[in-house]
Amino acid sequence: MLCYDVRWPKTVITTECWRPGIGPQSRPGPDRYGGAVPPPPAARDKVLDAFERLLIEHGERETTLDAVARAAGVSKGGLIYHFGSREALIDGLLARLEVLADEDVALMNAAPEGPVAYYIRTSAYADAPIDRTLVAATRLLQRSHSRTREVLADVHDRWYQSLLTAVGDPATARLIMLVGYGMYYNATLAGGDPGAPGPAAEDDEVLRLLQELVRAQSAGKP
């Protein structure tokens, strides 16, 4: 019987054997089931980072498994070890977004200045992890991924619910949401760079006006 190890990139994933008259067979490699560590979890994040980056820079059409593997600096077999298909890559990206949204909503609800101020001050694109993952996910909507649409809708609804709890009025909460969307869009017009810094003084003025509106609404004024 002739045998050889299949490795990724230095770890034995499986051992392929060939017995004359029978054909190829596989048996678990010692590193996979014999106590050694499989490819490190960091490699999975590296692949997701590459997928995210390609989506942002080139759109969905350029995110083939081969392209993602090249961008991540891994073999295609290494990519498939973590993500067996392109749909699995998308699921991984959406799972990352849900985790980041959990963290962001927790920060929003615990912010000393309150959810409204936190939401407005973080609405401008800052190249934070959640910013990048959100932009990447929106690129997937170009081909109507229903699962992506559901996750994005859930993320935005959680921001809305946090604002609604803070201000107590659905219309006011929605207005604040739309102002945040507008601030993000305005940032993208700054030389086409969504990460370009915006005028902080203007942001402060927008926040002041919104806070006045919230106070007036709470007091029952028009």
Predicted regions and their residues:
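Short, intrinsically disordered or compositionally biased N-terminal tails of bacterial proteins
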Residues: 1-38, 222
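Helix-turn-helix
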Residues: 46, 54-88
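Short amphipathic alpha-helical elements of helix-turn-helix/winged-helix folds
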Residues: 50-54, 122
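Alpha-helical DNA-contacting segments of helix-turn-helix folds
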Residues: 90-97, 148
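Hydrophobic alpha-helical connector segments
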Residues: 99-137
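Short acidic/histidine-centered micro-motifs embedded in hydrophobic/aromatic stretches
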Residues: 122, 137-140, 179-183
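Hydrophobic/aromatic-rich alpha-helical bundle segments in the mid-to-C-terminal region
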Residues: 128, 146-153, 157, 161-222
